[in-house]
């Protein structure tokens, strides 16, 4: 299974660039780790992929928070993926998201918030932040992620 991972699409232009949609159209699933700002982002993603899941982020308005969960646990084959946004100081994000999923027995934790990519294995858990798709406030580049799950997990960051 090939999973496209995006986060932090909040910016002055709330549309996902066509080139990014094109690169994500062959995914089996797309996960958005929050800070959508507008639900039309999900409509764009659903136009290219049937299986789209998302959580709300700290910048999302109440209308989005009413429609999306704060966290999800998704099973793909024999692997469990935790999806959340995160909050607070970026230096402590991994600890925070670990605590959010401490009783969920996950193999991967996908999160956003920091705007810079993380692809790091600690113990038995892969921590994956795709970076921001549209905002370079805290990173020198925009990015998204691809996670491939077969017998193993392979994850990579794609710089835009």
Where are these regions (language model features)?
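Active-site neighborhood of phospho(di)ester-bond hydrolases with catalytic His/Asp-centered motifs
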Residues: 5-7, 29-35, 53-58, 83-85, ...
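Binuclear metal-dependent phosphoesterase catalytic core
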Residues: 77, 104-106, 128-160
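N-terminal active-site segment of His-dependent metallophosphoesterases
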Residues: 1-47, 51, 60-69, 78-80, ...
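Short, positively charged, low-complexity/disordered linker segments
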Residues: 98-120, 126
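Active-site environment of divalent metal-dependent phosphoester hydrolases
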Residues: 11-15, 37-41, 59-65, 88-93, ...
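Beta-strand-turn-beta hairpins that frame and shape the catalytic cleft
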Residues: 1-3, 73-82, 121-127, 149-156
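Active-site-proximal segments of metal-dependent phosphoesterases and phosphodiesterases across multiple
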Residues: 60-105, 135-138
